[in-house]
A protein has these predicted regions:
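Helix N-cap at the start of a conserved alpha-helix in ABC-type nucleotide-binding domains
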Residues: 102-104
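Conserved ABC ATPase "signature" region
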Residues: 29, 44-62
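Catalytic Walker B motif of ABC-type/P-loop ATPase nucleotide-binding domains
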Residues: 91-95
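Hydrophobic anchor residue at the start of the ABC signature
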Residues: 80-81
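Conserved ABC ATPase signature
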Residues: 66-70
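H-loop/switch region of ABC-family ATPase nucleotide-binding domains
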Residues: 127-128
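Conserved catalytic motifs of ABC-family nucleotide-binding domains
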Residues: 87
Length: 147
């Protein structure tokens, strides 16, 4: 890894834990076992689920590309696919739309909205922008400086 790439990783804050340059599909698959890295080989059905989520987030065509060579937006989308791959009951998202272009912001908002509409699903989402919040939320906590 060159100095420029290491610098870019430190600046992005998203990928430092993925210093092994694994294919994007393996990064998504690591979400099946909540691990950083892929230590247990997923079976064909699990890999199909990973590819499905990558398709939902619009990055299936990048499944074999080295994760660290993806753009920051593509990395974000792959990591979001990783978060959803296990169909969690509780999903915690920290600024999931950060760094995405308008098209992908819209795409991710729709996916988040669909997740929030499902029964027995809970999501905690951190954002600086109220317009990024799903319309289906039932509770909101706003933090304001000095209050």
């Amino acid at each position: 890894m060159g100095n420029q790439e290491a610098y870019r990783l430190r600046q992005s804050g998203d990928a430092p834990c993925y210093l092994k340059n694994l294919p994007a599909i393996e990064i998504v698959a690591s979400g099946l076992h909540d691990s950083i890295g892929l230590y247990k080989r997923p079976h064909a059905g699990q890999m199909a689920v990973c590819e499905w989520w990558m398709d939902i987030f619009g990055v299936a065509h990048l499944k074999d590309e080295p994760f660290l060579q993806l753009s920051s937006g593509e990395q974000r989308l792959a990591l979001l696919a990783r978060a959803f791959v296990k169909d969690p009951e509780l999903l915690i998202l920290d600024e999931p739309l950060h760094g995405l272009d308008t098209y992908n912001r819209r795409r991710v908002r729709k996916i988040i909205e669909a997740f929030c509409r499902r029964r027995d699903k809970t999501m905690i989402m951190v954002t600086h922008y109220e317009n990024e919040l799903p319309e289906t939320i039932t509770h909101r906590l706003s933090l304001t400086r000095n209050r």
